[in-house]
Structure formats: C-alpha cells, structure tokens
C-alpha cells in the first residue's frame, strides 16, 4: 500500500517538516490557514517563470516569514531588490495590510534532482505537444546526472492524443516507498493539452536519513586487484 499514501505526509515528523509552522487556537486557525493558501497562490501565480520549488511559512505574532525556494533567484529578487519589494507590497495588499511580511529567497542547489521542478518541466513539454516518452527519458537522464539514488515518473491521461486514457510509468534505480527513513521527494502537476488533462507524478529518492548521522552514502563494492597471469615459459627444443 506504499503507493496509496502521500510520501511527504507519510514522513512528517520523521524525515520531513511541515511547510507551514505556526500555532493558533481553534478560533483563528481557519483564518490563518486561508491566509497561507492565499500566499502560496499569489506567489505561484506572480512568479510562475521563476521555477518555484517550495514555499515555507512561519508566523510570529503579526509577522509572517516566507521562505521561497527557487531555481532562478535573480527573477524573484529583481534589479536592486525591486522584485522582492513588489512581491511584499502585493502580499500585504492581498492579506489586508495588517501583517508585517518578510521574504527570504533560497536557491535550489540541485535543480535536476528536485521533484517539483522536474514535474513542471514535464508538464510544460507535454503542453507543447512533445512526445511523453522523449520528455520522460530526458528528465530521468538529467536526474541521473544529478546523482539521485532513484526516480519514478508516472504520466496518466490521453497520452499522445490516444482515444483511451492510460497510465504509464518508468522507474530507474531504487524508490523505497515503505522505508520511513528514505528521503523521498514527491510532486504532482497537471498538463492541460488539447486532448484533455494529463497528470504527472514524480518520486525522487535522494538517500537514507539516519538520526545523528549524515545522509548515508551507497555502499561501494570492494575492488580486488586482478591477479596477473604468469606467462608460461616454453623451452626451446628446436635443436634436439
């Protein structure tokens, strides 16, 4: 049943953290939850070309700290910080203006190993009517060059305009969904084509996280030196 549950929600509190970190009583919780939703929708809509990977929100009294993980920090920051200032003003207007907003931009270290960015890339290519097999193969090759331990890509819908919808998936390497200490990055995106909506799901296995230790490196097989064969010596008996 490992495929029936969200891999990130399954590991919350073990190897994954919540994307919104704050506390509220039962009277203010719905309001703050709606604010988080508005913040995420506003950022994703206005920075759709910046390669947004993750948005984390923290709250302290009337202060909201927003951490944006992006593949293109220059697009978010803008010239002289004008982009961040415009984003902050827009968010304050959207939330009513009574919140103090601070924005921190974090660059994604490995773009080709991020499940969200891989899913967005595949969805964009499918909307341009590129063959799904070619797109998936390219995405997997790029992820392998980024040295991930394993990746699984699933595409569902009317693939290549087929009359009957189907689901196809490709996996390279290990993707242990039942292992709780496994660092699984998951993302889901939809591609709107002229034939209908295609669903794209990405699982990326980045290694195992053991408490108190660094990320476990895969065991390398011990290499034994090859024995050199001695060349046989033949006696010269031609004169006998």
UniProtKB/Swiss-Prot annotation:
**Domain of life, per lineage:** Bacteria
Outline the segment boundaries, as ranges, of region: Disordered: 214-240
* PROSITE patterns to which the protein is assigned, alphabetical: KH_TYPE_2, RIBOSOMAL_S3
Kindly state which keywords UniProt assigns to this record, in alphabetical order: Ribonucleoprotein, Ribosomal protein, RNA-binding, rRNA-binding
Pfam families for the chain: KH_2, Ribosomal_S3_C
What GO annotations for molecular function exist for this entry?
A: mRNA binding; rRNA binding; structural constituent of ribosome
SMART domains xrefs = KH (SM00322)
GO biological process terms held by the UniProt record: translation
Record bears the keyword S-adenosyl-L-methionine: no
| Subunit structure of this chain's protein | Part of the 30S ribosomal subunit. Forms a tight complex with proteins S10 and S14.
Family (UniProt)? Belongs to the universal ribosomal protein uS3 family.
PANTHER family, sorted: 30S/40S RIBOSOMAL PROTEIN S3, SMALL RIBOSOMAL SUBUNIT PROTEIN US3C
Record function comment: Binds the lower part of the 30S subunit head. Binds mRNA in the 70S ribosome, positioning it for translation.
Q: What name has this protein been given in UniProt? A: Small ribosomal subunit protein uS3
Its gene name is rpsC
């Amino acid at each position: 049943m490992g495929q029936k549950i969200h891999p990130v929600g399954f590991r919350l509190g073990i190897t994954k953290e919540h994307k919104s970190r704050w506390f509220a009583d039962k009277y203010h919780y719905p309001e703050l939850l709606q604010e988080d939703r508005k913040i995420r929708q506003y950022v994703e809509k206005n920075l759709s070309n910046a390669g947004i990977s993750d948005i984390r929100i923290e709250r302290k009294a009337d202060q909201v700290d927003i951490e944006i993980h992006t593949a293109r920090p220059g697009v978010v920051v803008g010239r002289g910080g004008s982009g961040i200032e415009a984003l902050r003003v827009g968010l304050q207007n959207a939330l009513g203006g009574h919140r103090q907003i601070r924005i921190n931009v974090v660059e994604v270290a490995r773009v080709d190993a991020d499940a969200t960015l891989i899913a967005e890339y595949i969805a964009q290519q499918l909307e341009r009517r590129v063959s799904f097999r070619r797109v998936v193969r390219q995405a997997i090759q790029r992820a392998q060059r980024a040295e991930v331990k394993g990746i699984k890509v699933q595409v569902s819908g009317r693939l290549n305009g087929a009359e009957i919808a189907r689901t196809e998936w490709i996996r390279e390497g290990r993707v242990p969904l039942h292992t709780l200490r496994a660092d699984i990055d998951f993302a889901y995106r939809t591609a709107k084509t002229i034939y209908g909506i295609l669903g794209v799901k990405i699982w990326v296995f980045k290694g195992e996280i053991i408490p108190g230790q660094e990320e476990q490196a895969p065991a390398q097989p011990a290499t034994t030196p090859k024995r050199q064969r001695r060349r046989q010596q033949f006696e010269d008996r031609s004169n006998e």
